């Protein structure tokens, strides 16, 4: 009796399995037939054509830049034709900072790089530059940075009618971080009360004050370049100095803050009201601003006798 039941169950399930296979084969034949398109349209989901806004493929742009750089390999690798508006360098929809300010800064940096390559034999021994750099010198360097950034903020406030957007939406975090770092470094420096801002700092502050009275666009360019250059180099610079001086704690001013992004946002908004002459005046001032801010590197240029 049990044997018969098992045989019946086996036969029943085998028929079901065969029926499924037969149904699947017949369905595939039907879909391939002349009336199959009706069934396919019923079964398949609707497909919608999304006409998205055309976007810029930045990955291809980066690959193109790398390929162009490799083509310039050799002594001419840094000879870039900045007058040529390449497809990946120029976009009409971009704003003033990306269209004109950043390419100008890149051109200035490229010129400085060529000068460094010419004089690399003079600067080949880096130990000559670190011999006299002490914790007192580092504290003075931080004080110089703090006083310069503070003076820039004060000049923005004094000329509120011209720089109103920078007061409310511009940089405002870095000075607080530098102040906290000065308090900390002072605690690990002997005779820290005797350390005061350097003559280089006072000279640069005087230069900024004169510029703000004579040419506010030029002053704005100096302020932007100072913020931008410190933003790009601060993490590596401050960490390297702390490592050299055996300062264990991480400085707050070496961390990321959005001051430069806020500054560039304000520049873009201000430039909408500028004439072509005002934009060219600002761009021309970037060269002098880059050269002038290098005065603070004299802290590191004390060559041992």
Swiss-Prot record:
Transmembrane intervals: none
Q: Which residues form the signal peptide?
A: 1-18
**Entries under InterPro entries matching the protein:** Haem_Oase-like_multi-hlx (IPR016084)
- Chief localization: plastid
Keywords, in A-Z order: Apicoplast, Glycoprotein, Heme, Iron, Metal-binding, Plastid, Signal
Q: Which domain of life is it from?
A: Eukaryota
Post-translational modification here is noted as: Proteolytically cleaved; targeted by its N-terminal leader sequence for import into the apicoplast where it undergoes proteolytic processing, resulting in an N-terminus starting at or near Gly-33 in the mature protein.
Q: What happens when the gene is disrupted?
A: Conditional knockdown results in severe growth defects and widespread parasite death in the third intraerythrocytic growth cycle. Impaired apicoplast development.
The compartments listed are: Plastid, Apicoplast
Residue positions with a glycan: 132, 159, 288
Keyword GTP-binding assigned to the entry: answer is no
Q: What does this protein do?
A: Essential for blood-stage parasite viability. Required for apicoplast biogenesis. Associates with the apicoplast genome and mediates apicoplast gene expression. Can bind heme. Can bind protoporphyrin IX.
Q: What is this protein called?
A: Divergent heme oxygenase-like protein
Q: Which organism is it from?
A: Plasmodium falciparum (isolate 3D7)
The organism's taxonomic lineage, starting at the top: Eukaryota, Sar, Alveolata, Apicomplexa, Aconoidasida
* Gene designation: HO
């Amino acid at each position: 009796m049990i044997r018969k039941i098992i045989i019946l169950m086996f036969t029943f399930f085998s028929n079901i399995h065969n029926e499924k296979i037969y149904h699947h084969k017949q369905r595939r034949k039907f879909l391939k037939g002349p009336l199959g398109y009706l069934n396919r349209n019923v079964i398949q989901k609707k497909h919608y054509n999304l006409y998205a806004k055309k976007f810029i493929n930045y990955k291809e742009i980066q690959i193109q830049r790398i390929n162009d750089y490799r083509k310039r390999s050799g002594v001419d690798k840094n000879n870039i034709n900045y007058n040529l508006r390449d497809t990946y360098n120029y976009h009409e929809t971009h704003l003033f900072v990306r269209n004109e300010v950043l390419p100008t800064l890149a051109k200035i940096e490229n010129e400085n790089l060529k000068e460094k390559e010419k004089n690399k034999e003079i600067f080949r021994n880096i130990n000559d530059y670190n011999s006299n750099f002490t914790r007192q010198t580092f504290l003075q360097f931080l004080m110089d940075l703090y006083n310069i950034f503070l003076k820039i903020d004060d000049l923005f406030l004094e000329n509120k009618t011209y720089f109103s957007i920078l007061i409310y939406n511009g940089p405002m975090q870095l000075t607080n971080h530098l102040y906290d770092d000065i308090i900390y470094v002072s605690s690990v420096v002997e005779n820290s009360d005797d350390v005061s801002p350097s003559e280089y700092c006072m000279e640069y502050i005087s230069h900024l004050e004169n510029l703000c009275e004579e040419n506010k666009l030029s002053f704005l360019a100096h302020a932007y370049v100072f913020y931008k250059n410190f933003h790009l180099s601060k993490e590596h610079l401050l960490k390297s100095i702390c490592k050299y001086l055996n300062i264990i704690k991480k400085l707050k001013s070496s961390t990321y803050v959005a001051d430069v992004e806020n500054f560039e946002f304000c520049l873009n908004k201000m430039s909408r009201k500028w004439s072509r002459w005002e934009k060219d005046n600002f761009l021309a001032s970037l060269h002098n601003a880059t050269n002038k801010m290098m005065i603070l590197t004299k802290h590191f240029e004390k060559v041992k006798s």
